[in-house]
Amino acid sequence: MAKVNTADVGFEKQIWSAADVLRGSMDAAEYKHVVLGLIFLKYISDRFEAKYQELVNEGYGMEEDKDEYTAENIFYVPLKARWSVIAENAHKPEIGLVIDEAMRSIEMENEKLKGILPKNFARPELDKQKLGDVVDLFTNIQMKEQGDSKDILGRTYEYCLSMFASAEGKNAGEFYTPSCIVRTLVEVLKPYHGRVYDPACGSGGMFVQSAKFIERHQGKINDISVYGQEYNPTTWKMAQMNLAIRGIDANLGDFNADTFFKDVHPTLKADFVMANPPFNMKEWGADKLQDDVRWKFGIPPSGNANFAWLQHMIHHLSPNGKIGMVLANGSLSSQSGGEGTIRENILKADLVECIVAMPSQLFYSTQIPVCLWFLNRAKKQPGKVLFIDARNMGTMVTRKLRELTEEDIMKIAGTYDSYLEGSLKDEKGFCAVVGMDEVEKQDYILTPGRYVGIAETEDEGEPFQEKMERLTGELSELFAKSHELEDEIRKQLASIGFTIK
C-alpha cells in the first residue's frame, strides 16, 4: 500500500506525478477525464462520509436518509460507490469496473450529476495496477489540523487542469484560462455579491476564482448566484465537477449548448459578466442571426465573432452591471466587417471603462496577443476611459510561458481602483485616463500604447562619450578573456591528442 501522504501544498504535484505514470499510451485530452473523475469521486465520498458519521453519532438512525444530505448540498453516495469500497478493491483486477459502477450508481442517486461523470475506467489500455496505486494515494491523504478535503481536492483538481492545459497545448484554450488572467479580471471587478455569468465558461475557472475572492474577503459564497454556458460537452461536464468540488452551486443549463443559437439563460441580467471566449472565432453562424436582438451596436462580421461575444454580454448586463473579458488585440483597432463602427457605437454609449494591453505568452494554447476589456453600465467616471499598458509585466516561468505575479495583478487592480476614486495620476508608459474627445481623434482605436506614451528612461548623468569609452573598454577586457579561454581549451584538447583547425 502507498505511504501516508500529508496534504500540503506539494500534494497536488504528488498526485499529478503518480497519475502521469498511469497515463501510458493515452493522450492528455482523453486521460484528463480519468484523473479528474477520480478526484471528484474522492471528494464527494469524503463529504458524504463526514456527514454520515455525524448522523451515526447523533443516534437517530438517519444516516441512510437521502434528504439529510441533499439539504446540505451534499451528494448522496450509495454503499458500492463509497471510497472505502473503492479502496478495498484497489488492487483487484476488476478495479476499473468497480469505479465505473460507482460512477453509474452516483448518477442514478443524484439527478444533477446524470450524464456528467466519466465511466471509462475499465478500458483495457488503462493499467489496473497503476490505477490501484493512484487510488491508494487518494486513500491515504492525511489532513493536517486545519485541513479541509474540499480545499485540498479543489486545489488538486485546479492544478491538474493547468497541467493538462500545458500537455495539450493549442487545444487547451477550450477548457482552461490561465489563472493569472482570471485573477486579474476578478480583482478588478470584485464580484462580492449578485449574479455572475460566463457565457463561455470552459471548466469554470472564472467562478472558482470568484469564490476564492469572496473567501479572501470574508464574504459568503451564497452571496453570488452563478450562471454559465459551455458548448463543448466534455468541457461542460468538467465544469460541473470542478464547481461541485468547490461547493459552488451553479446553473450551467441542463446540457451543453451553443451560446449564440441556444442561449440557456435568455432572460438573465447579470451583475458581473466574465469570459474568455474563443479568439477570432470564424464560421459562428452570423448569416442565420442577422436580425438578432443582441446586435444593438451593429451586426458582427461573419468571419470573426469577437464583437458578437461582446454584444451578447452587454445584452445580459444588469442596469449596474460590469463586464470583464479577454479578447484578441485585433478587437482594439480592427475596421474590417463593420467592427470599427460597432466599437465606435459601444464607446459612444459610454460603456467602456478600461482597456488593458496584456503581455505576450500568457496562454498555453496561442501566441495571439490579448487585451482585457472592462465595461460598466454605471461608470463612476462618465466620458472617460482608463488605458493600462501591462505588456512589460509578468515573468517567464518556462521558455514559452509567462505569468503575471501577484504584485502585477494587484498593481493593475489598484490602478483601476484609484481611477474609480478619481485619485489616479497618469504614469507615462503605463496608464492614462483619456476623455472621449481624444478617443474620437484616434478614430475610436483603443490600443493603450496610443494613449499612455513611452516610459521615460532614467538619466544616469553619464556623458555619452565617457559612457561609450567605458563600455568599449569593458568589452575589450571580455574579448581578451575569451581568447585566453580559447587558448586553454585548445591546449587541453591537444594534450589528449585532439586539435582544432
Residue ranges and their predicted role:
Residues 124, 146, 200, 228-232, ...:
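Hydrophobic alpha-helical scaffolding
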Residues 171-275, 280-296, 307-308, 327-330, ...:
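Conserved S-adenosyl-L-methionine
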Residues 14, 21, 30-31, 35-43, ...:
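Conserved Class I SAM-dependent methyltransferase catalytic core
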Residues 351-352, 362-365, 369-414:
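C-terminal, active-site-flanking charged/polar segments
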Residues 269-270, 294, 304-306, 320-322, ...:
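Active-site lining segments that contact anionic ligands and/or coordinate catalytic metals
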Residues 262-265, 280-283, 333-336, 364-367, ...:
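Switch/connector loops and helix/strand junctions flanking conserved nucleotide-binding motifs
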Residues 25, 284-304, 330-339, 359-364, ...:
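Short, contiguous acidic/charged loop-to-helix segments that flank catalytic cores in large enzymes
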